[in-house]
Amino acid sequence: MLHFLFHSGSSSNRNSSPKESYELLHGLDKQYQSTKDVTFRLVLVQDIGDRKKTVLFDSNHVDGQKGDSVLRDSANAPLTDLMFGAIPISHKGTTTKLHILHPPNPATRSYMLTQLFQINTHGTVVNSSHETIASATSLFENSSSNFSEDPNKPNSSDAFESNKEDSPLLKSFNDSAIPENAANLSSSSKNMKDSTLSSQKARSNTSSSFLTPLHEQLESRCALHTAAKDPFRSKNSLRCNRGHSPLSSQQILPAISNNTSEKPDSNNCGFLLPSNSTSIKDLKNVKKGNRLNSPPFITIPQSIKNTNSNFLLSSPSLFSDTRTRPASYALALIITVPYEYDEIVHPVSTYYTMLSNFTLSLQKEIDERIRNLLFVSLSSGGDNKNDTGIPLIQSSSSKVGFGPYALSKDLITAKSFHKCILLLKTGFSAPLIKPSVFSGSKWVENMRLLTDLCKSPAQKCLFSNLLTATRKFCLERQKDDVTFKVLLQSSKAPIARRFLYLLAPLMRPSIAQCSDTLLNPIQLYPNSGILSSSSLSTSFGCPSVSGSLRVPSYDMKINDSCKAIDIHSEKPSFADSPRKTSLRNYLSSSWRLKFMRSSYQNNETDPLNPTSGSFLRQPMQYSSPSGVSESAASSFLDIENIDEYLESAENMKYLPRSTVGPGGMLHVDLLETNAKQESEATTSTVPPSPSQVGFLKALHPSFDLQAAPPNSYVSFSDDDFISATLLYMLEDVSRNKSQLLAEKKHLKSQLMVANLDTYSLDCYEIHEFPSEWENDYAPFLLKEHHKVIGETYVSSFDIQQGCFNVIKRRLSSYKWDKSDDSFVSEVLKGDLKEVLRVCSHC
């Protein structure tokens, strides 16, 4: 369910090419201002049964002040119940869960991503040649060393040290506590390493092949002798005493002692509850002694002991031969974003791959840390020589766990949590596209392929004009509050994608500039190696204007409906050859675009719609999003009786066919009709065919740079489509239109359409002036080039013979000139950094 709701179609398809979907760019003109207001909260919760859920670590638990241990939602059950609920007890492995929480205040929205897991008590093994695959000391050594050897990565130790002072997560570790704990851990690691080496030498003469890091901990930290016979217990049982933890400043309630010669004290029952105000009653009950429901003691069987040495040789997991079991754990990431940010960039659908992978990586680190701490605590002696002991508790169901906030003072755990939060913040601020695709060598290779394809003068002219126009658009956007979009039309997808790669760094210089300093793309987007965004969940509508112009409205208040739509014509680009089903031909003949499906796809072609025909049925279906039925009839223009129209089999063939393809992509086949059918459709009483009405009513609101086949949009000779698109661009949610007009600023949106088949390049603009400028812009509006629509002015120009060189920002006529030959020559040299430098200093 999570895969189909939040994953892009290609990112989880193992057979897909890693280069697809690079054309998708984030649609914001600049980084949203409230990105800094996005907060991340990581919480580690433990479930030991008996409805006892304990918070072990909370990133908001700083300065010695405990947070809300219940973690209640504003209207729902406790968050701890949401983390662990509805999971079968027989389920093994890690489970990912997602919840939409009630926000703490109406101005924010909150989401919770939970990784539910159990620790791996067996750990890794040793191969037959006795070469250790994973050492018990690896966790301590790796955690105390650098996170990464690459100094440029923000997850290195330098980045950690530089951000430690600014991190509220690490402020709770005062100057005196950290060196002491660090020294203890360092000396502990050294002793463990030496002891492990000696134990490996001792094992070299044995036949043991299944030693785990957990038992290497036991070997190196303590020597377990054969227990003396005890008439009150099993002869191999070990008594639990109380100890003290220097890390937690609390009582270490269980500590397995190697001295069992004395009789057990009934008052010192194993795994007592932690010493806090909520457990006084339990402590009184424990002191009564001879409790009927006393938890079983951990018993080490005789088979795993060696009477001739002080080390355990070949042993399975300590929990496998006893009734004691480890607890279950939940790692929850709670994301809180401002309402405005959520309307533009849906955090779950946009960053799901990154969020899930970062939390899974943190979960693996926590698994190793808990496993080691658990066995160190279990193996610590009664003389309290253990420096890393953590207070333990045990439930009546024999599950062993830690006390409340037991890991809140563990430096290694805090570092792991802080590193994860640092990576999340870096990922949210990074561009949503793989930066390495725009490296110098890749860009040169792509540019040379395009120049080799441009052989005719018309092709070369289009190539130069397209580069110059894109550059001028970008320059004007930097200097003024202008929005623009670029649409490439072509019947050949590979050619259009090459142009997308070429124009992307010109429109987004940060993509290329950050490629050397950004995190490793494989670490950010490990599955696909590309951007992990989907279409953005937002709400918009074209404004109503006076006059005869009909502007369609769009309802995008959709929850969890971000899907990839693959739009392609029924007539393939390789018409002379039969259609092949291979993935390579599929990718080369179709278009990998992302759209909000219920806004850009007619509801009548929904796979779940029973009236849309049996050919729409597929094994994998989407859930129908909410809020679609209200605007379903408006998908077709002037349709009153949709049901009667759909009953006709003759009319069904004019509807786009929607099928679910590999990886969850939605395929939309646009059926082609001839001119006669279109002319009949215009005079007929039945609704017009999709080829006439147009399948998509506007350009995608989330992407500045787009590509599509020519027949997937309304004809660009239709003024209604052009004006509707430009009007929406004026109403960009990232701008405060009323404030800009109050400041007497001239608003403008621009649209450039390049048809790579006909070598034509058209630019469209729309202007909106303050009311005080009523007499000032009259000379600027020439009747032969402009149409007045209410109080908005639309202008279109055919610049097939050349691109504009300079846009006069003052209200005067445009000055048109040929393409910028000097800039084009810089591009042809292939030096991407030099090209970006020229762009930024023009």
UniProtKB/Swiss-Prot annotation:
Polar residues bias locations: 183-209
Chief place where the protein resides: cytoplasm
Signal peptide: none
PROSITE patterns hit by this protein: DENN_FNIP12
Residues annotated with Phosphoserine modification: 573, 590
Keywords of this entry: Cytoplasm, Phosphoprotein
Annotated Gene Ontology cellular component terms: FNIP-folliculin RagC/D GAP; vacuolar membrane
A GO BP annotation: positive regulation of TORC1 signaling
Residues of the uDENN FNIP1/2-type domain: 35-422
Record-annotated cDENN FNIP1/2-type domain positions: 430-772
Pfam families documented for this protein: FNIP_N
Intracellular or extracellular location(s): Cytoplasm
Protein name, UniProt field: Uncharacterized protein C30C2.07
